[in-house]
């Protein structure tokens, strides 16, 4: 189906965005 790749893309997007939302975690 098409849900699998969609969830993978969403996970990648979230993984990219979260560090920007929580910069303290990067330090």
Swiss-Prot record:
What GO biological process, any one, is recorded here? Answer: defense response to Gram-negative bacterium
Coarsely, its chief localization is secreted
Which locations, inside or outside the cell, does it occupy?
A: Secreted
**Tissues with expression:** Expressed by the skin glands.
**Keyword Secreted listed:** yes
Of the GO CC terms on this record, one is: extracellular region
Q: Any idea which UniProt keywords this protein has?
A: Amphibian defense peptide, Antibiotic, Antimicrobial, Cytolysis, Fungicide, Hemolysis, Secreted
Tell me the function of this protein.
Answer: Has very weak antimicrobial activity against Gram-positive bacterium S.aureus and Gram-negative bacterium E.coli and stronger activity against yeast C.albicans. Enhances the antibacterial activity of XT3. Has hemolytic activity against human red blood cells.
Q: What is this protein called?
A: Antimicrobial peptide 1
Tell me which species this is from: Xenopus tropicalis
């Amino acid at each position: 189906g098409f849900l699998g790749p969609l969830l993978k893309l969403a996970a990648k997007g979230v993984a990219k965005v979260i560090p920007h939302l929580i910069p303290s975690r990067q330090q």
